[in-house]
Amino acid sequence: MTHTYRTATKRYLLAILLASAAIFSSCREDFSVWKAHNEAWLNKNKTTIDSLSKAEVKNDYVAAGITPSGIQYVIRHSGYGIVAKRSSAVNVTYQNFLIDGTAVGHAEKYDVQMKDMVEGWQEILCSGLVRQGANFTIYIPWNLAYGKTGNKVASAARFFVPPYSTFISHIEIVKIVNTLPK
């Protein structure tokens, strides 16, 4: 009887474990539709950026284009002075959005190290396209922003920036401080 009781208990625990695994795995959000929507949006926006880059008369901007990595940009003022390096500290004013218009961050005269920025910001700021004083908008593919993991609100279960999100940033570079790499 003891052997039968232990076998039944093991089976019961195994059933609970399998049921729990099924429940928790079904709680994981599926972002495949969001990913496809973001990639389609960015691809459609590419047509607009291509048109802006080829325009003979550029109203309200000085340059538009797409980097080899796929970052799309519209530069309203390219700035003056120094270009940022990967070891730089910058002071920026910015607004960040998702493609559906959801605001996901803003700051005025925010000090930040280049290493603490998403890869898309680092690439553009160090590209030579913009300098101190620049004012521009970038459209960053998800793989150069918060990637497949997104960015969750601290101590919460909801996403601040969902996985696979195209990241739109309106940026003004207030100041660049180039420091020597450590």
Regions found by a protein language model. Name each.
Residues T2-Y5, F24-K182:
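Cross-family detector of peptidyl-prolyl cis-trans isomerase
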Residues A15-I23:
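Bacterial N-terminal signal peptides
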Residues T2-L14:
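Bacterial N-terminal signal peptides that target proteins for export
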